[in-house]
């Protein structure tokens, strides 16, 4: 059994990670940590996990083969020395995703730049071989995951793209602020980052395409939809052929139906799963390609992708513990 510890397990990503690991046939959870909730049973913070015999601790010492750092951005680089060398590490924050120049542009000065190159960017569809050999993995951001998966097959067709993102309330995490209370959050379609979103750096790094994000908060609890536009004067057949690079990927589903309930990707149909649904449209009159990508931000955009990476790092089938379909209806 793989012994797993989750550092910072009180947030939404941490809670979903604990849920997935608890159901994983090859994993034993040895520790979940939280400074705020140390000593409390896990279901006091994550009520859906009632019956799971775990308590939060505030220790830095535990028996683990893999440690998940589910902590806020900027924290991992401060605590990484507590865990380096003791176990494989999967970092859920943004601290080690970007090369130093891009990190500086989007986040500021990095406190541990010498460690950046030791981390593998944890998007299995692009870096499966490197992840299998890795000791340190940086889990991608949710918006970056959806956008990179959609844009990567077309990276040779364009050097810039417009990315319109509709994201759920859980993408903002569990932080308490007035904008997140129900009277303020309900029924919104709120632009909260019109340009220079931090996840742009991940897209530039992984695809070479200059992606300009505009991000909207919408009135859903989980899930996100990326709609990507770029100039394209080729054929519809060429667009489809490019997407077929994913035909054997276990967690990418191509949505190309011409009729029925779902003609294009919709986050409603991936909730609770590790799937990314990708589709496209071709606006020939205006010489535009429109590529769409839907994921559950907490699973493929977070905890599920982390488990997928763990599976690869330990030589397991990457579908282990993740091979289930989305919840429906939601």
Curated annotation (Swiss-Prot):
Residues annotated as the enzyme's active site: 142
Q: Could you confirm whether the keyword Cytoplasm appears in this record? A: yes
Instruction: Report keywords, A-Z.
Output: Amino-acid biosynthesis, Arginine biosynthesis, Cytoplasm, Lysine biosynthesis, NADP, Oxidoreductase
What processes does the entry annotate via GO biological process terms?
arginine biosynthetic process via ornithine; L-arginine biosynthetic process; lysine biosynthetic process via aminoadipic acid
Which GO cellular component term is one of those annotated? Answer: cytoplasm
Q: Any idea of its EC number?
A: 1.2.1.103, 1.2.1.106
Which family, according to the similarity comment? Belongs to the NAGSA dehydrogenase family. Type 1 subfamily. LysY sub-subfamily.
Please report the name of this protein according to its UniProt entry: Putative [LysW]-L-2-aminoadipate/[LysW]-L-glutamate phosphate reductase
